[in-house]
């Protein structure tokens, strides 16, 4: 993983560091901002351990979870420096994270999982039921191995994959047409309540909860043309799903833990084309973040924040239809003129999940090269002279 954010923070990992163009300080310590670039890991020795998927194929009312579906590696280095680390370490060793909404290897959810893993956290994943088989198969066949590489050269280990559809809180909420849908055939225990019960049964508790879920069936429609059904579907899948996740996972979260979601600037700015109620859903998500920060903080000492990330050309974002235009606009008009990477959002999430952010809660953190701060479009002909001077 190429961490591109310039920082003196260090990510402490559970695995030995390897000689590379990255700045290696000490076995198990990596500096965020060091760029492995074209690092070669020719001497990487990997042992992949695969075991059966659990809690995905059982049809009983009470969740019964099989052995974890895991991917682990052992990285060996010729040498490592025994220098004392400097700066502030991001150390999540001994912490366990559940990331809801990962279905491939090129979105923000995946990048967050990688950064948390690089900091030493154990990774659990919740995957949308219709995408589950493809995701599992891709993992088993090593199709994601290249994007699983961590700063120390080892591969991110996904301890367990759970089936999840966060639109449904419990089995009683699932309508008959969904139960009989062939895309859900063979899977069980995938409502939010059941997923939380399975995680509790398998691991007991978690420390970090990540919500990387959004869906607007009418996102391409202007708000004036959006149906009530489409609007409420966007709210349900994109914002209330976070409330439901935290509600059901909070009882198994260790005090001092953190919950993180992903939002977008359309919550407070007009983004033509981002319709179907999605802008409303993001606004609701940010408002809920503040309320949940109070409630979860007072009840369980859990911090709740959301990251307002800039546009990324992920597979999911392609559904918006103009994501490439937004990426270009962001590049041309942001204070920092560069392309935003998923790793930068992942590193911000690792910070928010760490003790370094112990006093940050109820906040919307912008990771968008500063685009949110701009009041004008610099690529407009009106500002041609200003751009030439700069």
From Swiss-Prot:
GO cellular component: chloroplast; chloroplast envelope; chloroplast stroma; fatty acid synthase complex; mitochondrion; thylakoid
Keyword Lipid metabolism: yes
Disruption phenotype: Premature cell death in several organs, chlorotic and curly leaves, semidwarfism, distorted siliques, premature senescence of primary inflorescences, reduced fertility and decrease in total lipid content.
Residues annotated as binding NADP(+): 53, 170, 282, 314
Tissue distribution: Expressed in flowers and siliques and at lower levels in roots and leaves (at protein level).
Annotated metabolic or biological route of this protein: Lipid metabolism; fatty acid biosynthesis
Catalytic activity reported: a 2,3-saturated acyl-[ACP] + NAD(+) = a (2E)-enoyl-[ACP] + NADH + H(+)
Transit peptide: 1-74
EC number: 1.3.1.9
GO biological process: fatty acid biosynthetic process
InterPro entries (alphabetical): Enoyl-ACP_Rdtase_NADH, NAD(P)-bd_dom_sf, SDR_fam
GO molecular-function terms, A-Z: copper ion binding; enoyl-[acyl-carrier-protein] reductase (NADH) activity; enoyl-[acyl-carrier-protein] reductase activity (NAD(P)H)
Keyword ATP-binding: no
Subcellular location as annotated: Plastid, Chloroplast
One Pfam family matching this protein: adh_short_C2
Residues of the active site: 239, 282
Activity regulation, short description: Inhibited by the phytotoxin cyperin and the synthetic antimicrobial compound triclosan.
Class in the EC hierarchy, top level: oxidoreductase
CDD domains: ENR_SDR (cd05372)
PANTHER family in the cross-refs: ENOYL-[ACYL-CARRIER-PROTEIN] REDUCTASE, ENOYL-[ACYL-CARRIER-PROTEIN] REDUCTASE [NADH], CHLOROPLASTIC
Chain's role: Catalyzes the NAD-dependent reduction of a carbon-carbon double bond in an enoyl moiety that is covalently linked to an acyl carrier protein (ACP). Catalyzes the last reduction step in the de novo synthesis cycle of fatty acids. Involved in the elongation cycle of fatty acids which are used in lipid metabolism. Required for normal plant growth.
Family: Belongs to the short-chain dehydrogenases/reductases (SDR) family. FabI subfamily.
This protein's name: Enoyl-[acyl-carrier-protein] reductase [NADH], chloroplastic
Lineage, highest ranks first: Eukaryota, Viridiplantae, Streptophyta, Embryophyta, Tracheophyta
Gene: MOD1
């Amino acid at each position: 993983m190429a961490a591109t954010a310039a920082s003196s923070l260090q990510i402490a990992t559970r695995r030995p560091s390897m000689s590379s163009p990255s700045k290696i300080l000490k076995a198990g310590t990596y500096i965020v901002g060091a760029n492995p670039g074209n690092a070669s890991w020719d001497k990487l020795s990997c042992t992949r351990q695969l075991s059966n998927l659990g809690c995905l194929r059982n049809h009983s009312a009470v969740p019964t979870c099989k052995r974890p579906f895991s991917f682990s590696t052992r990285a060996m280095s010729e040498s490592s420096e025994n220098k004392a680390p400097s700066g502030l370490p991001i150390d999540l060793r001994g912490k366990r994270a559940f990331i809801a909404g990962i279905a491939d290897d090129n979105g923000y959810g995946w990048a967050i999982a990688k950064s948390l893993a690089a900091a030493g956290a154990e990774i659990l994943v919740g995957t949308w039921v219709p995408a589950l088989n493809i995701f599992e198969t891709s993992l088993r066949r090593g199709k994601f191995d290249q994007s699983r590489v961590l700063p120390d050269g080892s591969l991110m280990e996904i301890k367990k994959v759970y089936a999840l559809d966060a639109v449904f809180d419990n089995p009683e909420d699932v309508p008959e047409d969904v139960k009989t849908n062939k895309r859900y055939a063979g899977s069980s225990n995938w409502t939010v309540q059941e997923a939380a019960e399975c995680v509790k049964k398998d691991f007991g508790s978690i420390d970090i909860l990540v919500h990387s879920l959004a869906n607007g069936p009418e996102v391409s429609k202007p708000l004036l043309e959006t149906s009530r059904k489409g609007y409420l579907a966007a709210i349900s899948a994109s914002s209330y799903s976070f409330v439901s996740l935290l509600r059901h996972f909070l009882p198994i979260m260790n005090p001092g833990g953190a919950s993180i979601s992903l939002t977008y600037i359309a919550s407070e700015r007009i983004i033509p084309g981002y319709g179907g109620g999605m802008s409303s859903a993001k606004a609701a998500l940010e408002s809920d973040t503040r309320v949940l920060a109070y409630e979860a903080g007072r009840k369980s000492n859990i911090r709740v924040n959301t990251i307002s990330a800039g546009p990324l050309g992920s597979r999911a974002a392609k559904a918006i239809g103009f994501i490439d235009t937004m990426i270009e606009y962001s590049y041309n008009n942001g204070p920092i003129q560069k392309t935003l990477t998923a790793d930068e959002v992942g590193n911000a999430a690792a910070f928010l999940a760490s003790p370094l952010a112990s006093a940050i809660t109820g906040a919307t953190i912008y990771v968008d090269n500063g685009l949110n701060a701009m009041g004008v479009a610099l690529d407009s002909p009106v500002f041609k002279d200003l751009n030439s001077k700069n």
